[in-house]
């Protein structure tokens, strides 16, 4: 999977290590020297998410005091990890679909589009197939992001991974604390 440019959808319960898998795919890919940009799609309001993903120009809205590059542009040449994509509002899904299909983004408040070269890895703990059926997730976007679906089993079913994950967490915390 890492050697391809295919869009990947990571499926699994909260806490299964989906971000760790996404980082691993990125680090083993030809895009490893490019940025790995994470966006939690469920943590932001719709308007903030749009600005976060696509950027905005000065004056686009009340608090837009300066131009801001979006996460898609920041990930150019690398990978964007769209965590909790199942939480994204339908109106934002349309905008994301356009970015995925056209390989370009438009900053909020701008008429100009910018070409992007990013690999997309998305993750969810929801059953997106069911979400498509009940109308809370777009069918066309689902098929665009699930080119390579990977199910990550819960940690309780793969206890042999616990020491590896614990080492990673300790190393990560230690480097953040400069120890």
Where are each of the predicted segments found?
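AAA+ ATPase active-site-proximal loops
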Residues: 1-115, 120-126, 131, 155, ...
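ABC-type ATPase nucleotide-binding domain
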Residues: 23, 144, 148
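Conserved AAA+ ATPase "SRH/arginine-finger" region at the nucleotide-binding site
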Residues: 40, 148-161
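Charged helix-capping and loop-helix junction motifs
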Residues: 134-137
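Conserved Sensor-2/SRH helix of P-loop NTPases
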Residues: 162, 166, 170
């Amino acid at each position: 999977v890492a050697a391809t440019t295919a869009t990947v959808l990571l499926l699994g319960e909260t806490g299964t290590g989906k971000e760790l898998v996404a980082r691993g795919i990125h680090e083993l890919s030809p895009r490893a020297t490019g940025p790995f940009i994470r966006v939690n799609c469920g943590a932001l309001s719709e308007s903030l998410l749009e600005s976060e993903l696509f950027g905005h120009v000065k004056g686009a809205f009340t608090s837009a005091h300066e131009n801001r590059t979006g996460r898609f542009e920041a990930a150019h040449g690398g990978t964007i990890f769209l965590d909790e994509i199942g939480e994204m509002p339908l109106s934002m899904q349309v905008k994301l679909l356009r970015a995925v299909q056209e390989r370009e983004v438009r900053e909020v408040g701008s008429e100009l589009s910018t070409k992007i070269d990013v690999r997309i890895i998305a993750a969810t703990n929801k059953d997106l197939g069911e979400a498509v059926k009940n109308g809370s997730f777009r069918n066309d976007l689902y098929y665009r992001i699930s080119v390579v679906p990977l199910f990550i089993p819960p940690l309780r079913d793969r206890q042999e991974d616990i020491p590896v994950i614990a080492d990673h967490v300790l190393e990560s915390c230690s480097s953040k604390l400069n120890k």
